[in-house]
Amino acid sequence: MNIALADDKVWHKGKSYRKGYTTGSCATAAAKVATLMILRQQVIHQVSIVTPSGVTLQLNVEEPLIHGLQASAAIRKDGGDDVDATHGMLIYAQVVLRNDATITISGGTGVGKVTRKGIGLPVGNAAINKTPLQTIEAAVREVLGPERGADITIFAPEGEERAQRTYNGRLGIEGGISIIGTTGIVTPMSEESWKRSLALELEQKRAQGMEKIILVPGNHGERFVREQMQLDSELVVTMSNFVGYMLQEAERLAFRHVVLIGHLGKLIKVAAGIFHTHSHIADGRMETLITHLALLGAPNSLLQAIYACNTTEAAMELIEAQGYQEVYNTIATRICERINQMLRYSPQPFQCDAILFSLDNQPLGSNRPITDIVEALR
């Protein structure tokens, strides 16, 4: 186990969570120890590296092998208490000394290949991100000195199977995992890393020339787009609860048309100016629904009944019974107004639309006819 992180924890809601280290740190440590083993011609069972964040990791080495001027070694990925798809897998490096001072880094079995533009790596390259490329080269150069070189191959036998649990397929990374990590350290409960992974898909689609995008909270939204709107799911990007962040990213990337599509219970919060829709941040669903119904002249008895509802689905039954379904269109319109207010100082504002649906995947309302929105997206 890594000694430096043994007592390094973060606190969240009164609980402590142990930090871990990234696939990039694993690859760096594996490459470093394999190089050391070649030079010393002996097996090494522990290796230390300094991560980009300045944290020193002392890591156990698994499956060390030496064969003349080449060696390989593995480091087991430990995500701490942030257990992701790569937690517990072995990341290997094979190092072969060269006759010149060049250091090359490539991906082998289980490391994905980049098949689309937009993630900061050339198409056809291994999915080894910029920071790990730098740390791997620096660690090996430190061991070899300036006069020697090596060919380094990073591989992960479980990578192809593990990658099926990640966003790699959507990002155009095929055949394996990504070797990533800007700090080298995994911080549990980190919203920033989650948000960044979502924004990466936006960046990729913009790099492909796309100017129109659909943002959805999750899988239900994508299903609605596919089944009810008959649109290509390539238009869809998941925003999770980070509505404001993803809208700002879409504005930064100069998308021309952004459509929010989601269940009433999630997107109604945006109509109230709540741009982080997780329940631990804010609720306001019933209050917002009641406000818009009151503006339509709904009777006090309906408002009182809806205020007592625990879910928007329950409220929808009461709304339908009394014929106030128009409220969904007014809420969708208000969502777009809130977004325009948030981005009012933008030098390049995008066109915004909003569509609300129910749990049974049926459209409820929109800021303008859904057929017009679909036509604009084609």
Swiss-Prot record:
GO terms under biological process: anaerobic cobalamin biosynthetic process; methylation
Any Pfam family: CbiD
Alphabetical list of InterPro entries matching this protein: CbiD, CbiD_sf
Catalysed conversion reaction: Co-precorrin-5B + S-adenosyl-L-methionine = Co-precorrin-6A + S-adenosyl-L-homocysteine
Family note: Belongs to the CbiD family.
Enzyme Commission code: 2.1.1.195
Protein name (record): Cobalt-precorrin-5B C(1)-methyltransferase
